[in-house]
Amino acid sequence: MEPLNLDNLKSMLKSPDESSRKLALGILKANQKKIPKKDLVRLYKLVPARECVKSYKDVCIQLGIEEVTLENYSSIPEKERSRALNSHKLDNITRRFNGRKVTVKENRYMPYFIKEAAGWRFGVSFCWYSSASYVVVGFYFKNEEDSDYCGKTFIDIYSELLG
């Protein structure tokens, strides 16, 4: 079998042809353990996050970072570990989806959740545009579609953070 040609894979991922991009993404996912980490991160940057992120593990692979667990937070009080871990996860998720830090000079979207007897559920994404400071802690996205996707896909992480 011929070695994987990263330049060809890169060209396919940049292709305007959707079937070529889907094929390249399939090849990328199937071979990600064989591709050097820095090349893998570069290739995944070419793919919109909504097309290739289905889990927090995907986020870690695509950012080239190790997946952390509660054990990584053993130095802080036990009751604060889950919140710290989930906050860390959401920070990485927003970093993967935004590709950068969203600034105060642009629209920022944040998923909102509704508390019901059965638990939290995704409600809507809210656009936040202001240079004023508010006491809202949020993990902002640069567009509503990514905010909606993450609010629904990562509701378990948000639920644990919200309590």
Kindly give the residue locations of the regions a language model identified.
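Short intrinsically disordered terminal tails
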Residues: M1-E2, D156, E160-G163
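Short, low-complexity, charged amphipathic interaction modules
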Residues: M1-L43
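Generic structural signal of hydrophobic/aromatic residues within well-ordered alpha-helices
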Residues: L9, A24, L43, Y56-V59, ...
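The feature represents the first ordered module of a protein
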Residues: Q32-K115
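Short, surface-exposed beta-strand/loop "edge" segments at domain boundaries and coil↔beta transitions
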Residues: K34, G119-F122, D146-Y149
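Short aromatic-glycine-(Arg/Gly/Cys) micro-motifs in beta-strand/loop hairpins
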Residues: V104-V136
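A short, charged, amphipathic alpha-helix used as a generic interaction element across diverse proteins
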Residues: K142-S159
